[in-house]
Structure formats: structure tokens, C-alpha cells
Design a protein with these regions (language model features):
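N-terminal Rossmann-like dinucleotide-binding module
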Residues: 1-44
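Donor/substrate-binding cores of folate-linked one-carbon enzymes
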Residues: 23, 84-165
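Short, surface-exposed acidic-centric catalytic microdomains
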Residues: 29-68
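Conserved acidic residues
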Residues: 34, 79, 100
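N-terminal glycine-rich "phosphate-gripper" loop used for MgATP/nucleotide binding
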Residues: 38, 61-62, 76-92
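Residue-level detector of anion-binding/catalytic polar loops
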Residues: 55, 79, 128
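Short, well-structured alpha-helical segments in soluble
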Residues: 67-76
Length: 165
């Protein structure tokens, strides 16, 4: 079985990226990360990627960036794009070009709590469980088909920081 060539998009700390890197190193995940792309030049996840010998690319997303992004993507023959804490909505043109190859790691049990501030929303709603979803990316925000979910019981003293971890 050949290994998937993947690119991971991040914006921040890169804790999910580190989990992916660790699971690749243990051969649990049969893939290779060929690059990590971030819209934040100061993202700690870029340090994690560099420490693992993974190429890093910073793309300024303040203006129209789809052309720059497509040039970068065309340089790689990728099988999978993983959005791992990437805090920008991808342009429709990009989603169409890579449809079926883009997955997102979202910190809620979709279809509940789409978008931002999921941990706060879960606590405010007094949910019994919280978790994460991996889903295919479509033009609908956090609305693509769900691939897998993991859940955990919310304990009495849990707060946003605990749920994030």
C-alpha cells in the first residue's frame, strides 16, 4: 500500500499537527506530510513542522490569496489536504479544485456547534458530551460528510481549557 502525500494547513499551536506527526512516526498513519502551510508566520505549529524536517510555507491571506495558494499546491502532487486548526475559510475555487481531498479536524461533535468558540458553546448548552469530528470540506461551513468522531464525557469541573486539551 502506498503512503498518502499530504499537506497540513495550520494557523496556531499545531497540537493536532504534532499528533499527526507522531502517528506517522509510529507508522499508525500511512502518510507523509510534504509541507505545512500557515497563514500565520508566528504559528508555533511551524516550529513543530521544522523540528520534524517538514517544509513550511507561509501564505498571506489578507488579500486574494487563492492564486498564490494554487501555485504552491501545484508544486506538490498531493493526495490529501488536512485542515488542522486553520482559521481561514478556503476560497470556493480551491475547494472545487481539490474536492474530495480536503478534510478538516473540527473541535465539536458535528453537526452541533459549527464554526468558532465550540468549547464555550458546548459548556453554555450544558451538553453531556464533547468531542471532535473529522469531515470532508465542502462549501458549507463544517457541513461536509463526517468521516469519524471521538467523544468524551464532560465532567462537572471542566472548563474551556480542559475541553481544548
Amino acid at each position: 500500500m502506498s503512503r498518502l502525500k499530504s499537506i497540513v494547513f495550520i494557523s496556531g499551536n499545531g497540537s493536532n499537527l504534532q499528533n499527526i506527526i507522531d502517528n506517522i512516526a509510529s507508522d499508525y498513519l500511512k502518510m507523509d506530510i510534504v509541507a505545512v502551510i500557515s497563514n500565520n508566520a508566528n504559528a508555533q505549529g511551524l516550529v513543530r513542522a521544522k523540528a520534524s524536517g517538514i517544509e513550511t510555507i507561509v501564505i498571506d491571506t489578507k488579500d486574494k490569496y487563492v492564486d498564490k495558494l494554487l501555485v504552491v499546491m501545484d508544486a506538490f502532487e498531493i493526495d490529501l489536504i488536512i485542515l488542522s486548526g486553520f482559521m481561514k475559510i478556503l476560497p470556493e475555487e480551491f475547494i472545487k479544485k481539490y474536492y474530495g481531498k480536503i478534510i478538516n479536524i473540527h473541535p465539536s461533535l458535528l453537526p452541533k456547534f459549527k464554526g468558532l468558540d465550540t468549547h464555550k458553546k458546548v459548556l453554555a448548552s450544558k451538553e453531556e458530551y464533547h468531542g471532535a469530528s473529522v469531515h470532508f470540506v465542502t462549501s458549507k461551513l463544517d457541513g461536509g460528510p463526517i468521516i469519524v468522531q471521538g467523544k468524551t464525557k464532560i465532567l462537572k469541573n471542566d472548563d474551556e481549557d480542559i475541553l481544548k486539551s
